[in-house]
A protein has these predicted regions:
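C-terminal, non-catalytic "cap/extension" segments appended to globular domains
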Residues: 1-21, 28, 197, 209-211, ...
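His/Asp/Glu-rich acidic catalytic environments and adjacent acidic regulatory segments
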Residues: 1-28, 33, 75, 82-289, ...
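Short pre-active-site segment immediately N-terminal to the catalytic Zn-binding motif
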Residues: 449-468
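Membrane-entry segments of alpha-helical transmembrane domains in multi-pass membrane proteins
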Residues: 14-26, 48-53, 251-255, 294-301, ...
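Short small-residue beta-strand/loop micro-motif enriched in glycine and branched aliphatics
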Residues: 221-222, 290-291, 451-456, 485
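C-terminal non-catalytic alpha-helical accessory regions
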Residues: 30-121, 551-561, 565-582, 589, ...
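Active-site-proximal, well-structured secondary-structure segments within enzyme catalytic domains
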Residues: 125, 129-131, 158-161, 168, ...
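Short histidine-centered catalytic/ligand-binding loop motif
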Residues: 191, 224, 231, 351-358, ...
Length: 680
């Protein structure tokens, strides 16, 4: 029988892909990759880009185009069969990656190309590919003795298994807890939209009443609006103890051992490669230059934000006491009373804004921003094969009418879909072996409430910001003009610069001129009224220091954990978290909180010793946007400068150079502090 993963040439045939196709396709693609590498090196006395790198890129691209839909479906349509198929491929992909990274012949060929006269005639993207490649050989243990190389391979394989297991445990633990409520009085204070969603969730399971889950669209409204403190506490405890040794499902899907083993292996592999800590190894491929620089950056920001964070908490305490007679605030009370305080101060709530952000208006408004700033047009394409009937497909064209890229949009939360929001690549822009241009394709994935009854999906303003964020990643991937796959789009971009375009695009969600067409009441079409807009903008920096301190807590926890790990003492996960909280947290912490056990970013998502990247890139994005504030948020010339210098360049040059070209100077932290309402 033919295998659709091996025969498709354009977009992935999602509806035809079955779990049994996965492993044979990946094995065949890897076999072809190995054969190609051996073939191009045989008798090749003068290795060149054309004779070595281009032919290998061709087969590598095929492997990633086969693996991408499999990996994506494992995240958005997870099933036991697909999960098994996906996991059966992780060891062989890891083995292949190590084999390439430790291939002496290939390493020598790269060195020969770098040393050749022809190197100077290669494009910047080609040169960067070779330079990055040589660095990656070193980081794959090319210089290690054979026994250590073998150990490196074993560790790499095990680490990819552990990351996948961690992720599965979080997904299973999230789906493994629900709360069935039959008495609507227990849900007093909850918005209509959340009640309707909980009712629909119960109906789908054949239950009366309401079903609450730990998915964010279900969990957050309870924490924010539900008057029932006992219910808030119950959900909070279930949520912060997912995949751990505590809470209602204690010991089920427990990630404790996985975390311990990951930290041990990360440390071992780093020492093997000559680094003191995993943090040092992590920075070898990033913009930041040293662990001291990162910790200095985080601690400096914490020092600026903490006094204001303490004031914000004190104001919340006073408010809860004066207005509600509450003298002790528990962690499951914070979101609830914060929302009440926000309403009291600004007379605005997320729920009042929701009717003004129906899906069709937000999506078309997003496309209008891309058009006004970058001159891009977005058109929906019908009839594209997808993994779920609610998924849509779009093409992006530039002002000349040239197709620049395409993307799948998967907006709604559902069972068997990983939580959160992300962008991933389906395929990359490159010139293929036949000399034809392959246009880039992205997946944009969110977890918003779906339409209920005859109402369209209505988004909170936070969700609008999330959609813009992921689209920012998307345009970085899709608008690239680089034609070498390994540095095209988001490829080859250091992790601490990759959030620049995503956080940058969020800014338009706060601009009156943009909100005029991003918003429109789902019944009347009326844009967000000026009075509401002013309240929303006034509330923008409500508890902003508390938010930044939470991000600093994540960033410092991650970086400290990987900087101070000592194999003699083992993982000090909870102790590290407690120490960091003492330094930066302004809210009390509970001994049984197991936030670390579902921190997928650093244990399953590539942000290990790198979570600081969000705040690092926030400095870049706020400063980049400040040029638009000076020159006009829809100034096409400024937009094209960002397009030409940042988005189109992908990973073909160092991000600091690209930033300076756009901004005319190095980044400054002032704009971030100003945007966050924090005194410099």
């Amino acid at each position: 029988m033919s295998n659709p993963l091996l025969t498709f040439t354009d977009l992935p045939p999602f509806s035809a892909i079955k779990p049994e196709h996965v492993k044979p396709a990946v094995e065949k693609a890897i076999e072809d990759c190995r054969a190609r590498i051996d073939a191009v090196l045989v008798g090749n006395a003068e290795p060149s880009w054309e004779s070595v790198i281009a032919p290998i890129e061709e087969v590598d691209d095929r492997l990633s185009r086969i693996w991408s839909p499999v990996s994506h479906m494992n995240s958005v349509m997870n099933s036991d069969e697909l999960r098994d198929a996906y996991e059966s491929c992780l060891p062989i992909l890891s083995e292949y990656s190590t084999w390439v990274g430790q291939h002496k012949g290939l390493f020598e060929a790269y060195k020969a190309i770098k040393a050749s006269k022809a190197f100077a005639t290669l494009s910047r993207a080609q040169q960067k590919t070779i330079t990055d490649g040589l660095r990656d050989f070193e980081l794959s243990g090319i210089g290690l003795p054979a026994a250590e190389q073998k150990r490196y391979g074993e560790i790499s394989k095990r680490m990819s298994e552990l990351g996948s297991k961690f992720s599965n445990n979080v997904l299973d633990a999230t789906m493994g807890w629900t709360k069935h409520v039959t008495d609507v009085n227990e849900l007093s204070g909850m918005p209509e939209s959340a009640l309707a969603a909980a009712q629909a969730a119960a109906e789908a399971k054949g239950l009366e009443g309401y079903l609450l889950t730990l998915d964010i669209p279900s969990y957050l409204p309870v924490m924010t609006y539900c008057d029932n403190q006992a219910l808030r506490q119950e959900l909070y405890e279930a949520y912060v103890t997912r995949a751990s040794d505590r809470g209602p499902n204690a010991g089920n899907w427990d990630n404790s051992e996985i975390i311990a083993e990951q930290l041990k292996l990360r440390h071992e592999i780093s020492r093997m490669l000559g680094f003191n800590t995993y943090s040092e190894k992590s920075l070898a491929t990033k913009m930041a230059e040293s662990p001291e620089q990162v910790l200095g950056f985080l601690n400096n920001l914490a020092a600026k934000a903490k006094p204001q964070g303490e004031r914000e908490v004190e104001e919340l305490r006073q408010f809860a006491e004066q207005e509600f007679g509450v003298t002790a605030l528990n962690l499951w009370d914070i979101a609830y009373y914060s929302e009440k305080q926000k309403q009291h101060l600004f007379d605005i709530s997320d729920e009042e804004l929701r009717p003004y952000f129906p899906e069709h208006k937000v999506v078309s408004g997003l496309f209008e921003v891309l058009n006004r700033v970058f001159g891009m047009g977005v058109k929906e394409r019908q009839g594209v094969d997808t993994w779920h009937e609610s998924v849509r497909f779009f093409d992006i064209f530039d002002s000349e009418g040239t197709l620049r890229g395409s993307f799948y949009l998967d907006l709604y939360a559902r069972e068997h879909k990983r939580g959160g929001a992300w962008m991933d690549e389906c395929r990359v822009r490159r010139i293929n072996g036949e000399g034809e241009l392959q246009t880039p394709v992205a997946y944009l994935t969110c977890n918003f409430n779906r339409p209920v009854g005859n109402k369209p999906a209505l988004f909170t303003h936070d969700e609008v910001v999330t959609l813009f964020h992921e689209t920012g990643h998307g345009i970085h991937h899709m608008l690239t003009q680089v034609e070498v796959g390994s540095v095209s789009g988001i490829n080859g971009v250091p992790w601490d610069a990759v959030e620049l375009p995503s956080q940058f695009l969020e800014n338009w969600c706060w601009e009156e001129e943009a909100l005029a067409f991003i918003s429109g009441h789902y019944e009347t079409g009326e844009p967000l009224p000026k009075a509401m807009l002013e309240k929303m903008l006034a509330a923008k920096n409500f508890q902003s220091a508390m938010f930044i301190l939470r991000q600093l807590e994540f960033g410092l926890f991650d970086f400290t954990l990987h900087t101070t790990y000592d194999p003699e003492q083992g993982p000090k996960v909870l102790e590290t978290l407690a120490d960091v909280k003492k330094k930066v947290a302004v809210l009390p912490s509970l001994e049984w909180n197991r936030f670390s056990h579902s921190f997928s970013h650093i244990f399953a998502g590539g942000y290990s010793a790198g979570y600081y990247s969000y705040l690092w890139a926030e400095v870049l994005s706020a400063d980049a946007f400040s040029r638009f504030e000076e020159e006009g948020i829809f100034n096409r010339e400024t937009g094209l400068s960002f397009l030409n210098n940042i988005l189109e360049m992908g990973g073909s040059e160092e991000p600091m150079e690209l930033f300076k070209r756009f901004r005319g100077r190095e980044p400054q932290i002032d704009a971030l502090l100003r945007h966050s309402g924090i005194a410099a």
